[in-house]
Amino acid sequence: IFTKAQNKIQDPAKLYRLIDMVDSTEWVTMGADTKGDIYEGLLEKNAEDTKSGAGQYFTPRALIKAMVECVRPEPGKTIADPASGTGGFFLAAYDFLVENYSLDKNQKNFLKHETFYGNEIVANTRRLCLMNMFLHNIGEMDGESAVSPNDALVAPSGKTFDYVLANPPFGKKSSMSFTNEEGEQETDDLTYNRQDFWATTSNKQLNFVQHIRTMLKTSGRAAIVVPDNVLFEGGAGETIRRKLLENTDLHTILRLPTGIFYANGVKANVIFFDNREA
């Protein structure tokens, strides 16, 4: 959580008032739900501020809750998100399991320590995610991190999961930054060459769809938010859609209303599919 943490408040008086305000609150008497709700509220408020750019890492909680309720995860099963953002899918799945099942001691321990696994390559967002999970009683402050800082698309995860819930970052192409000979920063399209992918493409969303399929156990289930290009793009997109229909039970496509995301004009959908034996 504290990896590469920085203090960006330069005004000593302002920092003093902030510390004094935090210190005056009786945090010990608050339940985990209250602290977690306060933190979630701050994240959502920050996402609503379009100037902050945080909205791209924050999936609307009503959408997350609806997706989790459609998938209906069960106790003792694993849940992954290869683009974790601030951890919304993990929290919603946690709440669903606690509210809908009478969990015994072993199931509660599994839920806290072994259920969730994710990736988030943006360091600040990953830090927000880990704190969000900790405040909602998922994982430990000093234990092994449930959210890896590595790019999920570079290589197979090496693990398979019962459920994958994700809203991969929008923006059509994967890219990488580098410094050219003149010392200037440039970006270049990034193509992932993986033997377990059906097609090679620089389209980020199509790569996430392929990657998520490889993350599923034989009986695994997935729900993914995707933009329109995943449904309509030709070439590699057509190949991936055909393979998805042949190799999984793609049973539902949910069209989302415009305006549901903080980024303006985004047209998005949720695809639900169940893996099956080859």
What are these regions, as identified by a protein language model?
Residues 179, 261-278:
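Flexible, glycine-/basic-rich loop-and-beta segments that form/coincide
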Residues 186-216:
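Glycine-rich S-adenosyl-L-methionine
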